[in-house]
């Protein structure tokens, strides 16, 4: 791509939480950002925050588990902002339950959004990266990839993201495309609030209990994850690929 051309990123699940923080950070880093979530209207706050700071952004609605919607979303970003060469696969859902209570539908939905969604988004976006001979793919995993009670579906999906990432690094490296996975620990989001509700704890007590188990003595914020992704999405991270980086405030074992 021309030296002075603005890089374009797509961040999925970017209406709120980690995705919104990542979209804003990449925009602050100078990228135009496709802000993608299930409903384009839900992305308005993120887009407005980026534009108010002088950045360029586009709200895009798509179900990442549906191939036709994914292709249309990537095409829209390429048309309106330019060919995407940075992709952050962050979209995710929870359907927590103990294994014997978990329905096949809950299993399929979680793996569909996390794994199928990352596969479809990457397949659509990598074409632009190959053409540019440059790309950055960052897949959101989780500390739950190591196993977590009540999250058989989510843990399997997040572990799968790590294997998917390493394979992408091997297949796409020849095109100067890197692929890395970021695995957050406890981050204050709607998802962790939902987990607190599932175990019948107030979110404040849940955070306090978690902080006692974390080496740095606090829970994480979405911006902690965004800082890490900012580096992995940068030109300076061209020799970092196929890695899983835990953003968890300390070792997990």
Regions found by a protein language model. Name each.
Residues 40-41, 61-72, 104, 223-224:
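The beta1-alpha1 cofactor-binding region of Rossmann-like NAD(H)/NADP(H)-dependent oxidoreductases
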Residues 98-99, 106-111, 206, 210:
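Substrate-binding pocket helix/loop in short-chain dehydrogenase/reductase
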Residues 102, 148-156, 167:
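Active-site loop-to-helix junction immediately N-terminal to the catalytic Tyr of the SDR YXXXK motif
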Residues 122, 157, 165:
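Active-site helix of classical SDR
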Residues 184-194:
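Short, flexible catalytic-loop segment of classical short-chain dehydrogenase/reductase
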Residues 212, 218, 229-230, 241-253:
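Short C-terminal tail/terminal secondary-structure segment
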């Amino acid at each position: 791509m021309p030296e002075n051309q603005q890089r374009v990123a797509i961040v999925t699940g970017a209406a709120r939480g980690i995705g919104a923080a990542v979209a804003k950070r990449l925009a602050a880093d100078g990228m135009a950002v496709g802000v993608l979530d299930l409903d384009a209207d839900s992305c308005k706050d993120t887009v407005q925050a980026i534009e108010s700071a002088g950045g360029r952004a586009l709200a895009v609605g798509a179900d990442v588990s549906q191939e036709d919607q994914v292709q249309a979303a990537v095409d829209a970003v390429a048309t309106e902002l330019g060919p995407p060469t940075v992709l952050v696969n962050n979209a995710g859902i929870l359907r927590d339950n103990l294994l014997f209570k978990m329905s096949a539908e809950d299993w399929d939905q979680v793996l569909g959004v996390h794994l199928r969604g990352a596969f479809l988004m990457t397949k659509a976006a990598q074409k632009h990266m190959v053409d540019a001979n440059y790309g950055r793919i960052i897949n959101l995993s989780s500390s739950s990839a190591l196993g977590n009670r009540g999250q058989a579906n989510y843990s399997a999906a997040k572990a799968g993201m790590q294997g998917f990432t390493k394979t992408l690094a091997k297949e796409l490296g020849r095109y100067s495309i890197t692929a890395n996975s970021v695995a957050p620990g406890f981050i204050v989001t709607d998802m962790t609030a939902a987990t607190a509700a599932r175990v019948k704890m107030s979110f404040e007590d849940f955070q306090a209990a978690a902080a006692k188990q974390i080496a740095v003595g606090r829970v994480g914020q979405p911006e902690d994850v965004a800082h890490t992704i900012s580096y992995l999405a940068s030109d300076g991270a061209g020799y970092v690929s196929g890695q899983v980086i835990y953003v968890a405030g300390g070792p997990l074992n």
